[in-house]
Amino acid sequence: MVFEKIDKNSWNRKEYFDHYFASVPCTYSMTVKVDITQIKEKGMKLYPAMLYYIAMIVNRHSEFRTAINQDGELGIYDEMIPSYTIFHNDTETFSSLWTECKSDFKSFLADYESDTQRYGNNHRMEGKPNAPENIFNVSMIPWSTFDGFNLNLQKGYDYLIPIFTMGKIIKKDNKIILPLAIQVHHAVCDGFHICRFVNELQELIIVTQVCL
């Protein structure tokens, strides 16, 4: 993991960052409908497939890798790792696991299945210990679909990393649709960036050839 510190004085987002981080602290969320028909038709497992696709786009663009590290420094990680929740039916609680990114889905899926098998029965909130600092959070609420979803973080105005929440899939017009809520910090991510993310995610799902 490499964390490249940002020189704010020469940063082209300096005035935007200062405005939305300090003057008018602002986070926002957007909920979109993602066509996942291709995922189902390819026989891919939905949750790890979406983790893989989301991570691919997150790691493509610096605005989703910009963060304040544990030393309070502003910078950009060279790679982000998905941290995701799993549900425990017996206690109706959840745990967070994390799986390192791989360039191909088959390798990522193998590591995901290894992690869920090894740590899936650990009922602690941190199911897989020693999470690195360069993680981003993903969760799924498969019991209900939604048109809007918002996280209210009391101390979240210094948290720059995006958060993703998925809901229950629905079928509409011969397509399988997944609701996806994306929460970002306006200091590092504008409407253009989040829309580009959504468009590239949808394109990646459609065009990717996956060998299972």
Curated annotation (Swiss-Prot):
One GO BP annotation of this record: response to antibiotic
InterPro entries: CAT-like_dom_sf, Chloramphenicol_AcTrfase_AS, Cmp_AcTrfase
Membrane-spanning residues: none
Gene Ontology MF terms: chloramphenicol O-acetyltransferase activity
Domain of life: Bacteria
Reaction catalysis annotation: chloramphenicol + acetyl-CoA = chloramphenicol 3-acetate + CoA
UniProt cross-references to SUPFAM superfamilies, sorted A to Z: CoA-dependent acyltransferases (SSF52777)
Family, similarity comment: Belongs to the chloramphenicol acetyltransferase family.
Subunit structure: Homotrimer.
Function comment: This enzyme is an effector of chloramphenicol resistance in bacteria.
Protein name in the entry: Chloramphenicol acetyltransferase
Organism encoding this protein: Clostridioides difficile (Peptoclostridium difficile)
